[in-house]
Structure formats: structure tokens, C-alpha cells
């Protein structure tokens, strides 16, 4: 069955219009742009990284937290986990195929490759023709500890 990724991405963007802080192609921050540009690509080689949607919201105390969102429009492409339940990004193909894995890849690039941001939120969105899934993952340090919330 073909992917409906673009349609799902547009639905997600429509929901985020209230935030007025999201983008796909524009810069949200030079340091984050450099981190995404210089990190290994989702395929494992060199090249830039392009999250489907980027947010840069501020907390009540005006602390900004980068949010990377990856959308997949093929049913069953939300997340790939290891037998222990952790997100499995050991294979580039899993980073490319699964929404959460791709979003975590981007969040990881920010946490590892910036001085200012040691936490990031990864969001995977997956919807097939008749089902919808969303997963948030909070990245908080370079040791790759994460906490997932359905």
C-alpha cells in the first residue's frame, strides 16, 4: 500500500498552527542547523538531516527546547525497538523507515553536537489509511537515556 506521508504531515502541521513556531525548511537556530548538518545522515553516510517538522517552543521560564518531528505514512512504521524495549537505531534502514527512530536520530544529533541543548524532544507520527499513532520521546543527555510516552 502506498504511503500517505505528505497528507499526514499536512494534518500534523495544521494541528501545530496554534504554536506558530514550526517549520520544515527554515532555520530555527544556527547551532541546531549546524548539528543537523554535521551529524551522520539517516542513511549512515555524510549529508544533512532534514526533519519533517521542527519546533522550538519556549517553556514558561523562557527555556527553549528543540522538538524534532518525523512523519511516516505507511501503516506500521511508527517505531522499531530492540528486544529490551529500547528504540533500536543500530541499522540505518530502521532510522529511515520508522517515524520515532528518525525523530530520535535528529534529537540525538542535537544533544550530541550542540553545547547549548542537552535535551530535545523527538516525536514520531504514523498514520496508515485507517489508523493513527503518535509517540513522544524525551532526550535529556548524551548518554542516550530516553523516556517514551504514548
What label would you give each PLM region?
Residues 1-121, 125-142:
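A short, conserved, highly charged catalytic patch centered on acidic carboxylates
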Amino acid at each position: 500500500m502506498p504511503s500517505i506521508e505528505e497528507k499526514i504531515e499536512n494534518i500534523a502541521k495544521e494541528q501545530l498552527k496554534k504554536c506558530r513556531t514550526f517549520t520544515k525548511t527554515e532555520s530555527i537556530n544556527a547551532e541546531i542547523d549546524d548539528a543537523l548538518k554535521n551529524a551522520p545522515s539517516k542513511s549512515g553516510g555524510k549529508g544533512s538531516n532534514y526533519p519533517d517538522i521542527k519546533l522550538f517552543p519556549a517553556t514558561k521560564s523562557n527555556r527553549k527546547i528543540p522538538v524534532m518531528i518525523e512523519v511516516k505514512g505507511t501503516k506500521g512504521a511508527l517505531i522499531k525497538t530492540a528486544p529490551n524495549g529500547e528504540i533500536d537505531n543500530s541499522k540505518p534502514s530502521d532510522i529511515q523507515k520508522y517515524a520515532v527512530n528518525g525523530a530520535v536520530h535528529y534529537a540525538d544529533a542535537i544533544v550530541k553536537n550542540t553545547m547549548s541543548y542537552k535535551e530535545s524532544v523527538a516525536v514520531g507520527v504514523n498514520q496508515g489509511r485507517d489508523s493513527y499513532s503518535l509517540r513522544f520521546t524525551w532526550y535529556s543527555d548524551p548518554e542516550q537515556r530516553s523516556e517514551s510516552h504514548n
